[in-house]
């Protein structure tokens, strides 16, 4: 049977066909919220079990058929989950199966958890574990799939299998070029003309764009923001789950860190605009410290000991600097370009906070080599 787009009424039968559900009739509801795909939650009527079904459409969901997109992008997500399950299974949802014909992924139901962005927008906090676990997640995945953690032949095969030209092109355009050009995806007004014509900024973004296109360091999540993280508690213990790695490919490690940092900094701008006391400002530091500590913990297991400890110090310094640049680019994109953040758009007056965040994004891009510590970045927030 060829590819078919699932509707709500099809899902229960589909799960039975795939051996994921019994004869009882579940409750099925569509909960699609992201830009790209359809998502269904399937729950037993007595509440004893549940599954989630995510299907890639042949177009971008929020745009419809006018923006076609191969549903094979779901293959990259399935491969990413397979890799993460080897090194950080506690930080992703349980995967029950992937159907490559229909580009549909069946996972655990995480409706007992909440999307991190939603919690933050409603005035909540990150808590003590979230950013630490995100830093560990990036370190564990990136070390294991880098030249330090994976044999050369295996890594070359991973690079080839993880090539994702359509989705990488989206990032190259939407994050790393369109915000600095006249483009239909942008939200420009006359006050931004000087920003767009800034030659230094454009050159620095071009450097980041080239790094994104050529820096095949490790397997990335590729879209690591506060909307792709769910948090909560289970059995009294904190839970952090990273999901939606469909933009996964082998690229520069700093891109994943940078996307997360951008979102934490924008959430800090929201909290400041609302006068909310919270733990927003220290999240970059917490995630970086955890990333660096976990990468160093894994370092003695590297497959090539020619890379010595002094090299590791230099390597981590480069990752830090590149992460800042990508963070700045993501902040700029989320304000000027495609897919704005509700962190800012739901403010009573989003303009002042957006303007401050935009200037912060520029500083992170053009001054990334000067900002050598989390404290330097935190000073920019004052």
Each PLM stretch: what is its role?
Residues 254-303, 327-344:
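Active-site activation/catalytic loop segments of kinase-like enzymes and analogous catalytic loops
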Residues 62-67, 117-121, 271-274:
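Short acidic, glycine/proline-rich loop/turn micro-motifs
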Residues 72, 115-221, 232-234, 238:
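ATP-dependent phospho-/nucleotidyl transfer catalytic cores
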Residues 29-47, 51-52, 203-255:
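Active-site acidic catalytic loop and adjacent metal/ATP-binding pocket
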Residues 102-114:
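Conserved short submotifs of the Hanks-type protein kinase catalytic core
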Residues 310-382:
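ATP/Mg2+ or Mg2+-diphosphate-binding catalytic cores
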Residues 58, 112, 240, 248-250, ...:
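Activation segment
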Residues 1-103, 232-240, 368, 375-382:
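Conserved NTP-binding catalytic cores of kinases and kinase-like/nucleotidyltransferase enzymes
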